Amino acid sequence: MVVKAAKNCQRCSLMFLDSEEDHHDSKNFAVAVTETGKGKFREVKIDDPAGHFKGRTIRVTGKVIVKDNQPQIEVDEPRQIEAV
């Protein structure tokens, strides 16, 4: 997927990489990087995953879940996201 929008959610402590500019778009697919995942990205010298992946095409591995009527994959490890 191409990351068209990327943002940190202050109230939920997740960082989102979205396939659409508007995260409410019914076509949006979200990659949610957990607080643990953000710490692990810092360990591999990626301090801002949102900025690092925005505009890039990525491949993500993990279990797809539906949260708030939107499909997403929660990421806990940097190896789950690959720039392609």
Predicted regions and their residues:
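OB-fold single-stranded nucleic acid-binding module
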Residues: V2-V84
